């Protein structure tokens, strides 16, 4: 099993690194070269800045039984058919039962932005958010 992480704007990098090191799990952060991630080079793959370049890199390499951590619902929908476990940065599991809801939310937000309707900005990430993500990741890895 490899844990692939869509690294651009990933707020849970230290948590993922810590858990993977403690459990000796292979992980790979994928990012474009405009982002400077604090991960070992052996666990980092840098792609060009083209649109969706990191997404296609992940989708082409991820395999049955692997794990993906991303907030990109388009990417999540591409890999779910490969029997991949997908987790977002909030610790929510993305699966075939709920991907349509996440994609619809993305669609609505996109339409609102096109009409210059902007919701309030995201709340600042809290320690509780990080703890929720960590617990979700550990529960999935432990098979619960």
Name the predicted role of every residue range:
Residues 2-144:
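Nuclease catalytic cores that cleave nucleic-acid phosphodiester bonds
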